[in-house]
Amino acid sequence: MTSADRTPQPARSPDPGADAGADAGPDADADLGPDPGPGPGPGPGPGPGPRGPVVPVVPVVPVVLVVLARRAAGRCLSFARRPYRDRPDPAYRVRRWPDLTALCLATVFFWSSLSPSLVPRPWYLQGIVGGITAAIGYALGSTLAWLFRTVVPRHPGEGFRTRCWQAYWLLAPFASVWLISESARMQRRLRVLQDLPPSLTWHTPMIALIALALLALALLLARLVRLGAVTLIRLLGRLLPRPVAYATGALLTALAVLVGVRDLVYDRGIVDVADRIAAATNGGTKAGIERPVSRFVSGGPGSLLGWDSLGYEGRNFTGSTPTRAALTAWSGRPSRDPVRVYVPSTPPVAFADDRPFAAQAALAVRELDRTGAFDRAVLAVAGTTGTGWVDPNVAEALEHMYRGDTAIVAVQYSYLPSWVSFLVDKEKAGQATRALLDAVRARLDALPEDRRPRLVVTGESLGAYAVEASFGTVDALLAGTDGALLMGPPDFSPISRELRRDRDPGSPVWRPAYDDGAHVRFGQFPAADLARPTAAWRHPRVVYLQNASDPVVWWSPDLLLDRPAWLSRPLGPDITPEIRWFPFVTFWQTSVDMAVSYGVDAPHGHRYGAGAVDGWAAVVPPEGWTEADTTRLRAYIGHRRAAY
């Protein structure tokens, strides 16, 4: 090989340090390759020389992970040996580590909340009810532990506490996961009972996380309150004797919490926000609802009430009135334009009156006179819910049954949702309906008996309560009307509560028989239920549509500590046999159930669907009305698309 074929080599530096510096670049290790064995030494001159030791390069990231893993394992082992912590200094004002007794009771309450209730609930509401009940359980457990420490001078030793904590951490997480998974099976069974698809989305980790987050939030708030109380007591202790400082500090703290919850959270928070949302909704109009062209409807031509003044539910009610042509097409016989009168919560100034709801009642009678309502075959007074809602199924069923020869009148007392109205002004429901009934009956009394329309009353949910509160007793209801159709009355409704309490022996509370069904009957599946008992059913008649699974019917503060009668055997037809009563827990389950009671199909939950057809057919059947007519109208009402 000639010298021209050789690869040019860089000149070698005579300084060994220069070589070292040149080889110290980032790719120095990559150029080494495999060990060539003995070779020229590092210094000048030929001859083999020893190669220096190669130091292996260890990656930094795996080393860090190993160190962290060892540290975590050490802490886990340390925690396993002593799975709790005491306050590092007795001067700490608030306990830092949870109390074992309280945590155990919180866990038991959470497990209890996983049991099924009246209607299926989604996973996120299960997490909410689990967190609320766990917080209640923690509060009770903490109170019991404090009482025990106060009464018993000797405390368990460290070894016993360690074993108890170890048992808790070993059992509680696994049991919670298994019970959450088992609750999904129970929810699917309940869905099948209530004619829903068995498919269900049930996020076990999210349920646990939501419950833990709510429990942690409640615990944080409680400890902040306690810290404030202890700090206040210590400050007062510098000025007052110790007992007086304790009493004064506790009283001031309780007062501050009460004022904060009542004024800030409840009044300015929940109620104020709900009022603003409801007021904005009340000013709108549902898509598809238009101003009526019939002079027989409030808000129409010649009405004493402007269309814009009726409110959201008033416009829904009057703007969806069926026409004479539609009623004729359905019945095949000549029909009339039905009368619908609706008076909003704020009547025109010209009808102002100092008496509660007297102005609205007077205006309603004026509208009834204007539309010729007292010349119709049936006049129905409808109690409204908190928002002013009237069930369209109830109204249209009566109008189709009588081919429009009807008049329906309602007065709005609030635009708030029913649950807010119940909390704020429940009494207004009864006052408004009573004022309307008094005014209507006074006008009817002025007519000859043979020219009076049949007077019936109806209402659903808080509207049913409004009707019942107007009469007070079942005897007054029977004496003052020609019949009543009431659906889903809340537990605090006076008449239905009396009927369930004084029911005939042997009849269940969810389907009570009263006075052998002489005038009043209850039903969930009215086509069959209203035929029982077999004794004669005399007029006037009262029909209650009451679903066994309706949480609105059964919710009561008594659920906190008392086992309800509706959980006694036999259970209702759509109640799962796996339902149980637990103190405090069942109350919150039923409270949450009310929020989803419209998520099922009729006749389950708080949905009554076309049951109004059977109800009206039993209470005030038109002359010549047959069972076939009821079946046909039930199918129509049940399958048509409601206007609102």
Model-derived features with residue positions:
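N-terminal acidic, proline/glycine-rich, low-complexity intrinsically disordered segments
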Residues: M1-G17
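Gly/Ala-rich beta-loop-alpha elbow adjacent to hydrolase catalytic centers
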Residues: V457-A464
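Short glycine-enriched nucleophile-adjacent loop
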Residues: A464-D475
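Intrinsically disordered, low-complexity proline-rich tandem-repeat tracts
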Residues: P14-A22, P26-L68
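Generic low-complexity, intrinsically disordered sequence content enriched
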Residues: P36, A69-A72, R81, I637, ...
